[in-house]
């Protein structure tokens, strides 16, 4: 996914309108944003000698809603989804040691949190370097969820929390 696919919606019902209405309407995203950010690229590059064993492809797999009803603000139906992207298309904040491996917009219903399982696979020259599955990932509409840590070199238990509205500071749970 990319920022070009960002979208906003709102449904307003007007009853018994006898003149031109004048009102302010605040649009909201129908998406949760899922970011997967690694912090171990510098370690990999420093410890891999002349052959750099950093991934050249990332895939992220999860099940996601495929339908969004603007009137009810509900996301429904679902399908398995796998994104295949080149890693490091952006850095996070001003800290260059953090690399965004994937950013996905996922349809979400209003006023509820969806819990997902997300699988990350890092590849180099079509060979799998590392696969990690993250369970119980909370996704909420108009919130950003960051999975952040040494995701390419370690496995373990990850704690992930969501952050309200994308304009506020990120809610990063760092896992080493």
Residue ranges and their predicted role:
Residues 43-143, 168-176:
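Tryptophan-paired
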Residues 23, 34, 118-120, 147:
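Hydrophobic residues positioned within well-ordered beta-strands of beta-sheet architectures
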Residues 1-5, 14, 103, 113, ...:
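Intrinsic disorder/low-complexity signal
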Residues 11, 143-144:
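Generic recognition of cysteine residues
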Residues 38-42, 124, 151:
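A mature extracytoplasmic/lumenal domain signature
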């Amino acid at each position: 996914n990319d920022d070009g696919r960002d979208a906003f919606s709102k449904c307003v019902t007007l009853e018994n309108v006898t003149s031109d209405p004048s009102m302010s309407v605040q649009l909201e995203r129908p998406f949760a944003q899922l970011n997967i950010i690694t912090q171990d690229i510098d370690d990999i590059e420093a410890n891999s000698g002349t052959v750099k064993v950093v991934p050249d492809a990332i895939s992220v797999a999860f099940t996601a809603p495929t339908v969004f009803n603007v009137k009810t603000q509900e996301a429904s139906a679902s399908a398995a989804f796998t994104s295949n992207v080149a890693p490091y298309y952006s850095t996070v904040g001003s800290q260059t040691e953090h690399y965004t491996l994937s950013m996905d917009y996922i349809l979400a219903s209003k006023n509820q949190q969806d819990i997902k399982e997300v699988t990350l696979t890092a590849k180099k020259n079509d060979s799998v370097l590392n696969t990690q599955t993250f369970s119980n990932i909370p996704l909420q509409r108009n919130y950003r969820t960051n999975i952040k840590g040494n995701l390419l070199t370690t496995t373990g238990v990850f704690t992930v929390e969501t952050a309200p509205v994308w304009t506020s500071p990120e809610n990063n749970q760092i896992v080493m």
